[in-house]
């Protein structure tokens, strides 16, 4: 049998430098400032993956493994790959939640300063007004005005 198009190490996907390539890792000892809504979104994603998606996938992979030949079993191969992705995301979320410091902008009240969690209106010279919210890395989305 030819080994031309097979991987030498099936677990090659497990070894990665980062848990999530979408955001850089925080430097050691750095707090991850986040709004209460952002913290809740991260926590709900973590709990959904841990309690719903992962157990269902483990059951599917178990069933696929019991069908015999794993080398040509699409359900098994895809399931294992997806399981690695979920585990990677769970590790990333756990680190982010552990290093999070929730900052509630409502406790600051009205003031004339820009601070974390503030919503700022900017008026350009041509009269166009834009609204931006100052948020942490996990919530940043320039298209929605979250910077």
Language model regions located:
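Helix-rich terminal scaffold detector
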Residues: 1-91
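Residue-level signal for pocket-adjacent positions within structured domains
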Residues: 21, 29, 97-98, 129, ...
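Generic structural "secondary-structure junction" signal
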Residues: 36, 72, 99, 104-105, ...
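Structured, basic alpha/beta domains of bacterial-type, RNA-associated proteins
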Residues: 89-107
């Amino acid at each position: 049998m030819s080994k031309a198009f097979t991987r030498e190490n099936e677990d090659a996907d497990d070894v990665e430098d980062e848990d999530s390539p979408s955001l850089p890792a925080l430097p050691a000892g750095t707090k991850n400032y986040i709004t209460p809504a952002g913290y809740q979104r991260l926590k709900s994603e973590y709990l959904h993956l841990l309690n719903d998606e992962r157990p269902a996938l483990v059951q599917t992979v178990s069933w696929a493994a019991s069908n015999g030949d794993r080398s040509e079993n699409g359900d098994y191969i895809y399931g294992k790959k997806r399981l690695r992705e979920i585990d990677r995301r769970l590790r990333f979320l756990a680190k982010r939640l552990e290093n999070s410091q929730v900052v509630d902008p409502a406790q600051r009240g009205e003031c004339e300063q820009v601070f974390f969690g503030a919503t700022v209106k900017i008026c350009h010279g041509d009269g166009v007004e834009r609204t931006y919210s100052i948020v942490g890395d996990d919530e940043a989305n320039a298209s929605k005005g979250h910077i």
